[in-house]
Amino acid sequence: VMSRENKHFSGPLLLKVVQEAGLVHGEMGLFHYHLAGKDEPLFSVANILEPGRFELSEIATLQTPGLALFMRLPAVVSGEQALQILLQKSRQIAAQLSGSLCDEQRMRLTDEKLAELEHKARRYTAS
């Protein structure tokens, strides 16, 4: 999720938005999304700026141009389900931050790239 037009996301707004999306701050200073009753995160959110973590003690002054959302497969649900949840939450976060959903090259996520991600995700069944 990237900010638009070389702007930045503020820490307080970012914290509010990710918490509303159901993510919690945790291990390695990242935000994590857990399915109900599961210990292992389904996906995590990092700051695209090094070192990638979010220090809650510094969130009031944080300014970042973007967020990296990532997951490890296999997961507790199928790869397709995991990807759909990640995309739904990514879209929610992007909309609330007035950001753009982008790929790993920080280019807008195209239908072709989305189809490629879906194809890769289909290879994984729930663990």
Where are the language model's segments positioned?
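Active-site-adjacent structural patch at catalytic or cofactor/ligand-binding sites
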Residues: 43-50, 61-75, 88
